[in-house]
């Protein structure tokens, strides 16, 4: 048991994680920082037995009051120490936990293993003003485990004055990060992200500059708060305007700017419409400095409107279907207010990932120099493809616990059917051509075809049009990708005017009454896969026959919620009124047999062509990759003068990677089936 000493001593240690509290009075978000409750289990599920998380006990960014006779645990997402990640990805043998307190009480220090088994490893009695230090070895965490501490107040309040985890080991990299924020007409959100970063105490030790790439017509610089931020940041704020080139264009510009800053070792990509935890930014940079070799360090995403709920703890690309997804669907949208760190056993196992979303992603500039910038695809799959490309070059991606942002959830979106459907279809196929290890892409082509046919059964002819355009552009090869960066979005949006179903009826008084009263829809779980197929085979053929005029007139047959509107439900009707995913209105879909037949023939032909030409296309895309992601190509696209600098991908790597890619594509017949 360490002795509590009255005064802190000077240290040359490097702080890698501070214990912090939320800056806003939001009780919901407090569960991500502390756990003051007692828990039990009912039927194997965690149940909170108390409600001791008091937002009014937060006294400052690093100060917390523990009421007399009560206890608080820092076994939380933001304040537990992810020991498993530090052991796996760095060479640090131990960290020191330093806790500064005032008042009487007890400190208990815990660790867990990969199975979530908790062990108390140390404790200290404190009184008055005290500083307690605990040496915590980073051993026996290879598969998982965390460190944390609890505070128990004595007969009077115990106040945490501050705490941190540090190391005396020198980092492998000492440079800072240049932030790259891409924004398009979210000026109010964007200026708030800059404000949160600018006002965090100590963040200047981690950040070299903040680059805002403004691609919209509603300028960030016109926001009332912008002049004061510009004055505070001075030369550290780099505000740029350019045409709308999507996320990949904006983030590539951020990479280009970071490469020109001698003090930067990293570029930190951030979305413009997030709430950022600045301490997480500092932790990501600290972790990135200590990794064995350059590593992409990603932050997790929480729901902006359900603050304790995480989107996904770890994500992968299913190489056979070539589709992104959580590594484990049972861990999807986990709510820490319902089950915190100590109650959630799977959170203790280290989770390795294939990629991390670019809502928050720290990329070493060594990686950028070697593998290039973003794929020129506007939006969708640029982040996943980049990590897959990095992996091909020996660079890993880590989704790092304790580094996170809050972002609007995908739950209120359905971008697979709106204008973004084009980018989903095209960019997924391009990423698969670049990285699939399977002969003719494995199951990817079949899965893409199935998705297209489902949209036809759902009478989503606009979506199918975009899918078709996307596949056609894939078949055209990689040479036109940069040329389309500034124009394809306009083409896609212009297509919508030809399709009446794209009109959202937002006035409830204007909603037509359905002719059929539907009380329920046949559920997937009741049918099973075999029953679902039978249902589709029964109802599908009607789409080849001309619909009755009465069924496709002003009144739809049925009115369905967004969750009811599955393909097997809509396959049985000639028309339907369907709610949008965000609940803002409804869209009127009508069946057209002639369109269905024409579109079905086209999508079958396109996917046959994709399968037939897969080996050739894979070789073309892989051979072109170094060029289309190079600094020269991107400087030309964003309108910057050429510098005559060396290629982004080193010649040795580029030649080897390109020849290897072409060879692997041409030998696909002998690879996995």
Give residue ranges: language-model regions.
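Terminal low-complexity segments of carbohydrate-biosynthetic enzymes
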Residues: 2-151, 426-673
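Short beta-strand-to-loop acidic/aromatic patch adjacent to the donor-nucleotide binding site
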Residues: 262-275
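A recurrent flexible, glycine/aromatic-enriched loop bordering the glycosyltransferase active site
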Residues: 328-360, 414
